[in-house]
Curated annotation (Swiss-Prot):
This is Gamma-secretase subunit APH-1B. GO terms for cellular component: endoplasmic reticulum; endoplasmic reticulum membrane; endosome membrane; gamma-secretase complex; Golgi membrane; membrane; plasma membrane; transport vesicle. One of its GO terms (molecular function) is endopeptidase activator activity. Probable subunit of the gamma-secretase complex, an endoprotease complex that catalyzes the intramembrane cleavage of integral proteins such as Notch receptors and APP (amyloid-beta precursor protein). It probably represents a stabilizing cofactor for the presenilin homodimer that promotes the formation of a stable complex. Probably present in a minority of gamma-secretase complexes compared to APH1A. The keyword tRNA processing does not apply. It is a multi-pass membrane protein. It comes from Homo sapiens (Human). The chain crosses the membrane at residues 5-25, 32-52, 71-91, 115-135, 158-178, 186-206, 213-233. Weakly or not expressed in leukocytes, lung, placenta, small intestine, liver, kidney, spleen thymus, colon, skeletal muscle, heart and brain. InterPro entries: Aph-1 (IPR009294). Belongs to the APH-1 family.
Amino acid sequence: MTAAVFFGCAFIAFGPALALYVFTIATEPLRIIFLIAGAFFWLVSLLISSLVWFMARVIIDNKDGPTQKYLLIFGAFVSVYIQEMFRFAYYKLLKKASEGLKSINPGETAPSMRLLAYVSGLGFGIMSGVFSFVNTLSDSLGPGTVGIHGDSPQFFLYSAFMTLVIILLHVFWGIVFFDGCEKKKWGILLIVLLTHLLVSAQTFISSYYGINLASAFIILVLMGTWAFLAAGGSCRSLKLCLLCQDKNFLLYNQRSR
């Protein structure tokens, strides 16, 4: 039974991300490099966030329980802010690299920023999902594990779906974020930051599984729709894609936009 929970939750959390990688990235070496670079940027942001949280914890050591709770909330919000800062830094790096490639070899077609936004967002999302869910997933293999410390038996299933949401949201956030940077609409960056903070804040009321998942999926659908439109999608292009009549639909179009 525990093996079924383990593999079921693993496929729920990482199955869509694995499918995206296999069908849209694995066949292109350059995309794999950008994906790994995006994952590395997220790892560096996590390292810096951990250092900030550790220093804050040392400063307020031996304080009462509520203070420790506020420290945890502070750490989560700082982590989100640093992640978005590194997303912006990665955008600037990719922009400079694209401009440098054009100046060195004008005849070379550089990958579109929309494609790079998707790939980097998937890199952010996969690494975020791995670090947030792997420990919980390993506990599901325990002998007769139902819940953790009296939690609901649905805890693992809830965590798997939340991990799925976070991974896909990072993809959508990446596309919307890069689009805002390209158009110099800085309010879009603020919206990405606020929605990221909102989804992260929901983890502090994790006992309300139904409410958390419903609100997270609403944000996912809204951000997914926004990302689809920002990537140049339309009802017509979606129809052509579903009918397999447009081979250059969105991500497979290599023309710089």
